[in-house]
Amino acid sequence: MANKDKRICIIGGGPAGQTVAMNLEKKGYDNYVIYEKLNRVGGKCFSPKMKMGPKMDEERTIEMGAVMGCDTYFAVAEAEKFGGASHIGGPAMGRKFMTTEGKELKKGLAEKLNMLLKLNKMTKLLKKKYYGYDVNGHRGVAKGEYDGSLPTTPELKIVKGKNPNLKDLSMPFSEFLKMNKCEAAAPVWKGPFTSFGYGYFDEIPAAYVLKYLDGFTVRQFLSVGKLWTWKDGTQSIWEGVNKHLKHPAILNTEVTKIERKEDKVLVTLNGKDTEEFDDIIICTPLELFLKYGDSTEQEKELFSKIVHKEYFTMAVRTTPDPDISYYFFANMTPETRGHLMVFYHRWPGVINQPVVTFTLRNHEGCEDVPFEDAKKTTIADLAKAGLPVKATERIDDWYYFPHVSSKDYADGWYDKVEAMQGKNHTYYAGEVMAFGDMEETAEYARELVIRYF
């Protein structure tokens, strides 16, 4: 029998931590605490309000982090239901593909047809040859297995099975497409993947790309009218959950030290107060645990292999106002890292609104573009596109998309971490265990509670 009275420490109040707490409550666990070092919950779901409109007297949310969802966001839908948020009535998405000079990019008919043909081919291969590829998380993939939540089912049914072809998912996505003779389909995935900071296809294992943008989801991104947005911002989803929890997150509280004993865990907060727990669930970057936790040799070995993306967003006002979001495919290459890839124009028909720019600064094996250089380049790119910046409202430099290399993925990194779940009274959640978007993160956190509590 599970001990539902045990005291559980949840580190982090982002989508993972909120989902863990919500599902613990649903299973009858009432003795938990969430610690969040920021003054808000939601993590990279951050939706500050800014003034806009003809008289600059309308206050509306902008999105500095997570922007959108789609019809298979079932874990997010559970969070909406629990916390009272809704994507109904969110601002409609729209976009244009542009040259770096600000002219609309037109693809030839033959190029479009070839792209769609290869997309159809890849979709069929994913359904048959790579059955199980879209199962949440990475448990067993390096061994040719799948084991986790099936994201195409509203109940997020947990499935398990074997498929030796899944080992291919460890290779970089560009190699995966080439091996399957589907290179022409790459732009379909590049728009929602690279432009939003998740890296370049020659460096990122195919598993990350395809578990986030499975065959159904990537087609939803092709038809922007089907995408979800939130009038009150993605942050409102997790604020809603937090408000409805029996024990909302304790804000402005950083976990600064962890000591794991044989029968308890001592958690030090803000460098002074110490609390005692039976278990901890880490819902923040695992590699940061090495700085404050009493890491085992295995934790040190595995978590030191995690890499992340250097990615920042800026809310800027331009003259003139654009009327839609712009995507710059020419800047979505390793050689153009540090350039503007996309900006998000959130509110159709509303003038004087800031747009949010998205810029990626690093690539595996290459020198990082310094932050200040990338900032200047991004502003220059807007001017080049005919939208000079008149004011910068805010900048958020994110610790983004923790993941492992193709080599470490193929070497079974995930199975080694999964084998540590529950040892030393410790459980590992957070985005690295699935993917760096709110749905994959929430799905994994949900399933972790089902599996272990």
Predicted regions and their residues:
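Helical element adjacent to the flavin cofactor pocket in flavoenzyme catalytic cores
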Residues: Y212-K264
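N-terminal Rossmann-like FAD-binding beta1-loop-alpha1 element of flavoenzymes
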Residues: K6-V33
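Mobile amphipathic helical/loop "lid" adjacent to a hydrophobic cofactor/ligand pocket
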Residues: V76, E80-F82, S86-E203
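Conserved Rossmann-like nucleotide-cofactor binding loop
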Residues: A16, R40, E287
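Mid-domain catalytic core of redox enzymes
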Residues: K27, T256-V369
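Glycine-rich FAD pyrophosphate-binding loop
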Residues: E25-K51
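Conserved flavin/dinucleotide-binding core of flavoenzymes
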Residues: H345-F453
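Conserved FAD-binding subdomain of flavin-dependent enzymes
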Residues: R40, K44-S47, G53-G90
